[in-house]
Amino acid sequence: SYIYKMRTAVFRMSCTYGTRQFGLEEQGWVAWFIIATLFNRPITIYGNGKQVRDMLYVDDLVDAFNSFLNSKLERGLFNIGGGPSNTISLLEFLDELEKLAGKRPKVKFADWRPSDQKVYISDTSKLENTLRWKAKTSVRDGIKKLFDWVKGNESYFSI
């Protein structure tokens, strides 16, 4: 990019979720938990469920991309996630799902896996300071948007 004078940015993304996500147990866990809850499928939680993640709604990710495109920066490397203000534990997420679905998700607990992180929160300060970007969608609002979309499109997920 430097040789050819191409504007380039790398965004290191974490836990992006949103409407039109077809989550699987091993990838896209936010959508997977919602799909599993609506279809009475079991959810396996490795560890105690207290692990914390920052969550980034897809619309906010697109806003970050556009912030770079509309800037005068030639290049950039940015961490992007929900940041400290958009965190949730797996147990808190299950509580949110119960409120939305009107039923408790079916959950089974298994042993921690060697690669499981107990806490992951992206440091988005460079992105915030350089591009004046900040995630706008709260975790709870984003979960509700995705839940409503999955519920409104259940035929996509039935087996």
Segments predicted by a language model, with ranges:
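Active-site-adjacent segment of SDR/Rossmann-fold oxidoreductases
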Residues: 1-8, 36
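Non-catalytic, hydrophobic alpha-helical segments
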Residues: 61, 65, 80, 90-93, ...
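Conserved C-terminal active-site "lid" loop/helix of NAD(P)H-dependent oxidoreductases
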Residues: 58, 77, 113-134, 141, ...
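Glycine/proline-rich active-site loop of Rossmann-fold NAD(P)-dependent oxidoreductases
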Residues: 6, 16-32, 39-41, 45-46, ...
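Amphipathic terminal alpha-helices
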Residues: 139-159
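C-terminal "lid/loop" region of Rossmann-like NAD(P)-dependent oxidoreductases
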Residues: 48, 75-79, 91-94, 102-119, ...
